[in-house]
Amino acid sequence: MREQRPIIALDFPDFDTLKDFLNQFPKDEALYVKIGMELYYAVGPEIVRYVKSLGHSVFLDLKLHDIPNTVKSTMKVLAKMGIDMTTVQAAGGVEMLEAAREGLGDDPILIAVTQLTSTSEEQMREDQNIQTTLTESVLHYAKRTALAKLDGVVCSAHEVEAIKSVTSKDFLCLTPGIRPKGTDIGDQKRVMTPQEAKAIGSDFIVVGRPITQAPDPLAAYHAIKADWNA
């Protein structure tokens, strides 16, 4: 059973901002953090090594989407960093997903992005020319991801039950778009609270601004963690 902790999205522009944020947490507070494209491209692999040296788990969210051989080679590089989780785009197809799994190895969690939580059904149809419902598109990508033997998908909490019904109960569902009650939903169109997401079957949740922009990030994190574990 993989440990399930709320993942903090460290969507910062530079190394110093990240250090200042993490310094607000006790040294023995083991976190699970997400490092996205902005921070990784600004700092490079050093950012992963630094966060791992503090004893934290790292979800490196790069959403790789390229030809299978390139993705496989890139995953081999990421595996050497000691990351705990990373992402690819499900739209890359089964061959690319299988190549990603082979390159990364079996230990780190490998999940695929289905449809971004900022995507509406109208946007999907107009911009991606996918003429199904949003849920049908997500379920299609989830089934293809399971076929490629990845660990799970990134999805809205609203889609978790349906995804597990067409894959398996052990197929991981990581859900962004999580907001504590009474907070601004920002640019996320499909959101839930931590407790609601846990109740519906989410295995991991990702929370950013409600923690990183809180007056007291440590207190905000503990409140969200308590809600998740309630």
Curated annotation (Swiss-Prot):
In this chain, substrate is annotated as bound at 11, 34, 61-70, 117, 179, 188, 208-209
Q: Which SUPFAM superfamilies match?
A: Ribulose-phoshate binding barrel
Involved pathway(s): Pyrimidine metabolism; UMP biosynthesis via de novo pathway; UMP from orotate: step 2/2
Q: Which residues cross the membrane?
A: none
A GO molecular function annotation here is: orotidine-5'-phosphate decarboxylase activity
Q: What Gene Ontology cellular component terms go with this record? A: cytosol
Q: What is this protein called?
A: Orotidine 5'-phosphate decarboxylase
